[in-house]
Amino acid sequence: MFERCLYFNVNALARAVNRIWDEAFSEFELSPSHAYLLRLVLTSPGLTPKQISHELKLEKSTITRFLTVLEKKGLIRRRKGISSDAREQAIYPTRKAEKISADLEEKGDELYQKMIGSIGKNSMTSLVSQIRDIEKNI
């Protein structure tokens, strides 16, 4: 019945992937979204919420909520940015975040390998590429 339905099939895949990612990042007491935001900040310290929003393709208000959670956990700190806009902040990882950085990256690599093991490297590469192309074009 739903073999042609993009909405149904993309969401079914997202739920299945979310279950795997939720379990994987639970050891850090982070949701996958929080973990990926933190990984971005660890890789590129000093990004603004607007830049993070653009990179993660999430609304700025969502990023603000995620940053509040990470700040309460002691994983990020906000500093006044170099912009003329006093409201714009730069986001930096804390030492606590830096201590788990390698473990977060390792977990990301494990998940990638798990997906390759499930669907194969060519299928994985093709699927991610197609999803990114579709997202740009709709």
Q: Where do the language-model regions lie?
A:
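Charged, amphipathic alpha-helical coiled-coil/dimerization segments
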Residues: 18, 68-129
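Short capping segments at the starts of secondary-structure elements
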Residues: 44-48
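Residues within helix-turn-helix
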Residues: 49-50, 61, 68, 89
